């Protein structure tokens, strides 16, 4: 990290021996790191710093309540997201209930890949007014290649939620658009067929951006870089979902 002053304190406090110091500076073996945060908490130069912290439901709610005035004026509220919210479903459910008790509504943002029971439990809670459901690709081979898992559970879950008349109006399908990956005519029409079948009436298109590249680099990871479809192609996709599928469609990002 550019702020490093070469004091070597991080090497001394790392009980996992995941940090070494040489001519090239600090090197971190991520496979050995236990995320104890001793290095970051003791870094005088702030070259290593924690990007997250453990919190209780009450502590999170205290942060959320700081903006309650804005929620009251705009109709907004709390969004539980991730990562994947289903990886922390119990905590998310407790947070949603606590927020509802304070008069704060919640939105569940999910990839749809996880326990159907846990997902249904979360979105059925009285405090949940919106569900953002990601559909990245409908073709299973494409989904496995770029997401790493089968799209089967995702499609099963979106069908499960949309079959519930109380949940259906809450759902907005969100689709990242990546040139050469999921923006072909066949890919878009396959997604449109699912949306039409489920009776979902809201779609948000998310043209690809590279903001995650720097974040991945900062944690010693690598992320493949893609490109967004052209503005013209995004406009065509938007018209298709509006005119052929009958869904209100918005684009987040440059068009």
Q: Whereabouts are the PLM-identified features?
A:
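Conserved dinucleotide-binding and phosphotransfer motif residues
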Residues: 17, 46, 98-102, 244-245
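Iron-sulfur cluster-binding cysteine motifs and their immediate structural context
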Residues: 9-28, 38-54
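C-terminal accessory regions of radical SAM enzymes
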Residues: 185-189, 193-198, 206, 235-255
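N-terminal pre-triad scaffold of radical SAM enzymes
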Residues: 1-9, 26-35, 79
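FAD-binding FR-type
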Residues: 32, 53-59
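A structural motif corresponding to the C-terminal lobe/cap of the Radical SAM core domain
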Residues: 193, 199-201, 216-242
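Conserved AdoMet/S-adenosylmethionine-binding subsite of the radical SAM
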Residues: 58-214
């Amino acid at each position: 990290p550019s702020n490093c002053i070469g004091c070597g304190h991080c090497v001394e406090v790392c009980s996992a021996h995941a940090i070494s110091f040489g001519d090239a500076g600090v090197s971190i073996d991520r496979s050995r790191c236990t995320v104890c945060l001793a290095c970051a908490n003791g870094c005088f130069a702030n070259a290593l710093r924690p990007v997250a912290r453990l919190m209780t439901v009450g502590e999170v709610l205290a942060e959320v309540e700081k903006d309650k005035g804005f929620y009251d004026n705009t109709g907004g509220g709390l969004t539980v997201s991730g990562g994947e919210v289903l990886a922390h479903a119990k905590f998310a459910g407790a947070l949603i209930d606590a927020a509802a008790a304070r008069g704060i509504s919640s939105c569940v943002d999910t990839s749809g890949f996880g326990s159907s029971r846990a997902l249904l439990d979360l979105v059925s809670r009285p405090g949940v007014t919106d569900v953002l459901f990601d559909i990245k690709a409908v073709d299973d081979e494409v989904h496995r290649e770029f997401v790493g898992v089968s799209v089967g559970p995702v499609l099963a879950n979106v069908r499960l939620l949309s079959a519930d008349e109380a949940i259906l109006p809450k759902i907005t399908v969100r689709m990242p658009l990546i040139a050469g990956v999921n923006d072909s005519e066949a890919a878009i029409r396959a997604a449109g067929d699912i949306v039409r079948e489920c009776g979902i009436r809201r779609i948000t298109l998310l043209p690809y951006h590279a903001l995650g590249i720097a974040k991945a680099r900062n944690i010693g990871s690598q992320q493949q870089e893609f490109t967004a479809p052209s503005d013209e192609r995004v406009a065509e996709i938007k018209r298709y979902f509006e005119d052929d599928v009958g869904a209100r469609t918005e684009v987040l990002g440059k068009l």
